[in-house]
Amino acid sequence: MKLLENSSFEAINSQLTVETGDAHIIGRIESYSCKMAGDDKHMFKQFCQEGQPHVLEALSPPQTSGLSPSRLSKSQGGEDESPLSDKCSRKTLFYLIATLNESFRPDYDFSTARSHEFSREPSLRWVVNAVNCSLFSAVREDFKALKPQLWNAVDEEICLAECDIYSYNPDLDSDPFGEDGSLWSFNYFFYNKRLKRIVFFSCRSISGSTYTPSEAGNALDLELGAEEVDEESGGGGGGGEGRAEETSTMEEDRVPVICM
């Protein structure tokens, strides 16, 4: 998995780290290419020792609604048109786990995560409503301006109409957001198989009484990184050349998003 550069996401992420007085919101949206690098290939070989890539794994019912996708299909259509909709292939499961590892490294390792810790969400509408309700209840009016910008950026990156949407709902021992003072959290994966890309949207709310500055690690890293870039650019040298080469490599993995 490789993190893809997205300036729109970077701008939105700066607005997803918010202090509300009694709570702190820390969120981020990231885009990943499903193209496997060296470490991913090695991990995938180990992963496949427990089952072939196309073997289906059972998922847990989604927490977004009281209905799993298969039961939703049955209740609406009269027949269970999608009896396997609560399952995914081991290859897809690997992509979800690899995305978590890339996003949370080096603090957490999700290599032992199991399929029952993931769910497939019933629909895009369910997920959008769940995200909107969580963020609006936390930041109120500030989210009204951010909401269209956020979802437009996600749609441009991943083409939401084509996505299967998964969530990560671990037990307390495995949850990176399960610390004391955690009020709520969500982890959604928007997977576009055609584009071979995943947009990962992770957010949590922490009680202000238990919050410490280190909790906002991502936001702090971004600020420190910006300062370092300013210092390096002021000093000249070949650093800019190396960064340009790295950006160019990232862009090679991107393909234009065309919603069909």
Curated annotation (Swiss-Prot):
Region (Disordered): 58-85, 227-255
Location(s) in or outside the cell: Nucleus; Cytoplasm
A UniProt-annotated Pfam family: Maf1
Cross-link (Glycyl lysine isopeptide (Lys-Gly) (interchain with G-Cter in SUMO1 and SUMO2)): 35
Biased composition (Polar residues): 61-76
A cellular-component GO term for this protein: cytosol
Modified-residue entries (Phosphothreonine), positions: 64, 212
Keywords, comma-separated and alphabetical: Cytoplasm, Isopeptide bond, Nucleus, Phosphoprotein, Repressor, Transcription, Transcription regulation, Ubl conjugation
Signal peptide, first to last residue: none
Subunit structure: Interacts with TFIIIB subunits BRF1 and BRF2. Interacts with Pol III subunit POLR3F. Interacts with TFIIIC subunit GTF3C1.
Protein name according to UniProt: Repressor of RNA polymerase III transcription MAF1 homolog
